[in-house]
Structures are given as structure tokens and as C-alpha cells.
Amino acid sequence: MKSGEEEKRKDKRKIYLDTNLQIIFGITLTYIMGVSIITPAFPKIVKELNISAKDVGLLIAVFSFPGILLTPFLGVVADRWGRKKIIFPSLMLFGIAGGLCFFVRDFKLLLILRLIQGIGAAPLGSLTVTIIGDLYSRKELIAAMGYNSSIRSMGSASYPAIGGALAMVGWHYPFILPVIAVPIGFLVLFNLKTPEPENEVHIREHLNIVWKKLRNRQVVRLLVIGIIIFVMLFGSYMTCFPLLLGNSFGLSSLIIGLIMAGVSLIAAVTSSQLGKIIKFFSKKIILKISFILYALALSIIPLISQPWLFFIPIIIFGIAHGMNIPVIQALFAEAAPVKYRATFMSVSGMTFRVGQTLGPLLMGMVISIWGIGGAFYAGAGLSIVMFIIVFRL
């Protein structure tokens, strides 16, 4: 137990200056570049490697696939062997395989390297939030999750522009950036101070304990909320919003990218302020507010007739997203005991990937029946469902 004086000292310190958290920021900024940094190069890759537009999407698919299969397994290993023993080799694999892509001119070999890079990326997202859960608690936990989410949003907003600029020099230049994972890996190895769990229970007992925890009603509701959030995010927003902007308003890819970057920037600013917001509102109230804002933003989008008016739902959606994701992650982290937290967070990360996969498919079906506007109203409806679920947390 921490003494009262220690708690006061921790409350007064600026948590974002903590070396451990800054290293976690570095890991976050590294693994999210796996997709966003290369997508602006896709048109050039299609042309230079003489492949179809359909095939170029495999560069994302083969990168993402290992995460679905390996994330829970690597979470179990991290609980038993330690976080750093998984993160360090994962960063090495991510950086080296990613860097080798820079030198490859054969598409099949490029896919193999992307698959290997995806294996390296698989545990990084869930283990960063696991370590935050290990290091911080209560209001500090919310603040740390908020800062990490803010960093992730800033990276998501800036990487497409950086990748696009590099792709103007050559299609393969964006692939060199993941090499930064190598020095980040050594920072983790020598400078990251994290409590490593002493887990001596048999693997079967370990899995039984985790399974029992996952069956808790509150955790089940959090998992459902997580899936629905990512169905809405990757279906209604990530898939349908660009289609609306391009097909209905004739906006260029550059303008669409800048508009969508606005959400990430607003989310980044909002997340960075969660440490202050949590002093006035509970986590449940923050979640309720975020779902109301999600529903409002998605309901407004189909009604807009002038492109410049999109700044209204962009601001609303960005605020909602900046509030929501860090709080969801914090609730997951709090629900898991330290000995099983990596497994626990890995399962939650896998549910996010399920929502990410289902979102475009489900909203594609909605579009075929009710049109593009129906996809936004469906997303708003899902937000209301999540608002109701939060009452039962």
C-alpha cells in the first residue's frame, strides 16, 4: 500500500514527464505507423509493382491478421514471462522486417515481410495499456491512458501526411520509418521500469482464472461496448464518411484526409485533458456523455449540404472519441489483477479487432439496403445502445 505522502507527491507530479510513460508513448507512436504511414503510397505501389488495386490491400490484411490469432496467446506469455520479454523482441521484429520492406521490389516477398512485421506488432497495443495499468491507478490511470490516447491520435493524424510526403520521393520510402522500433526496443530493455508479475500457477489454472474474470457481468458489458465502438468507428466513420465526402461532395483524397485528420487532432486534445475531466465526472458519466456525442455527430452528418459544415460533427465526434477510448481501456485495466492483466487486455484488444473487422462488412450491408445515410443513423443507433449498456456497468 502507498502512504498518504506518496500519493500526494504522485498527484502533484506531471505524469507525462514520467520516463516510463514517455517510453510507452514511443511504443505507441511506433506500432500505429504499421498501416497509416504506408497507405498514401498505395497508388504508386499499384503502378510500380504492376498489381491490382484490390491486391494492394493485402499489405494491410497480412499485417493485421497475426494480431487476431496471436494477441491472446502473447498476452498469456507476457503474464508468465514478463512484459519486457515480449515487447523487446516484438519491437525488433517490427522494426527489422519493416525496414527490409524498403529494399524489396517483389510484391510476394513484400507480403511475407509485412506478415512478419505484423507478428511483431501483434502484442504491442495491448501490452502498452497493460503496462499503464501496472504502473498507475485511479485518477493517475485515467490521466495516463488519456495522454497515451492523445499521442496515438496525433500519430494517426500526422502519419498519413508524412507517408504521403515520403511516397512522393519513392513508393518504398514510407517503409523505412518503422526502423525506429529498434532503438525504442533498447529503451524498453534498459530504461523501462515495470513490475514484472511472478506467476507460478499452471497454464490451465491461469486460463481458468482469466476465463472466470472475463465472465464477470461488468467485463462482458465492457467487451460488448468495445466491439460496438469499433463497429461504429470502422463502419460508419472510417468506411462510410470518406465515401460520402468523395461521392456526394466530390472532394479530393487530400481534402478527405485533412478532414478526417481533424477528428484525430480533436481527440488528441480531449484525451490530454482527461486527467482534469476525471476530477469533475466519474468514468461512467464520461462514457455516457461520449455516447451521446457519438450519436449526435453521426446523426448530423447525413443532414449536411455544404462541405464546410462538416467541422461541426468532426469536433463533436473527436471530443467523444477522445473521452471514450481511454476510459474503456482504464476500466479494463482496473478489472484485471496484475498477474493476469496482459492476458486480460489482450482479449479486450482482440474484441476491438473483431469490431474493426465486422464494422465495414455490417455497414456495407446497411448501405445496400438504406443507402449511405442509413449507415450513419445505424451508427447513431449503436451509440444509443452503448449508452443504455453503460447504465448497467
Q: Predicted segment positions?
A:
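Juxtamembrane intracellular "pre-TM" segments in multi-pass secondary transporters
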Residues: 5-16, 193-223
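Helix-breaking motifs and short loop linkers at transmembrane-helix boundaries and internal kinks
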Residues: 50, 82, 103-109, 120, ...
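Conserved MFS/SLC helix-loop-helix module at the cytosolic interface between two early adjacent transmembrane helices
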Residues: 69-108
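Helix-to-loop junctions at the C-terminal end of transmembrane segments
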Residues: 71-82, 270-282
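Structural signature of the two symmetry-related core transmembrane helices
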Residues: 85-99, 285-300
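Cytoplasmic helix-loop-helix junction between adjacent transmembrane helices
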Residues: 113-152
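Helix-loop-helix hairpin linking two adjacent transmembrane segments in secondary transporters
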Residues: 147-190
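C-terminal membrane-cytosol helix-exit motif in multi-pass small-molecule transporters
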Residues: 179-198, 386-393
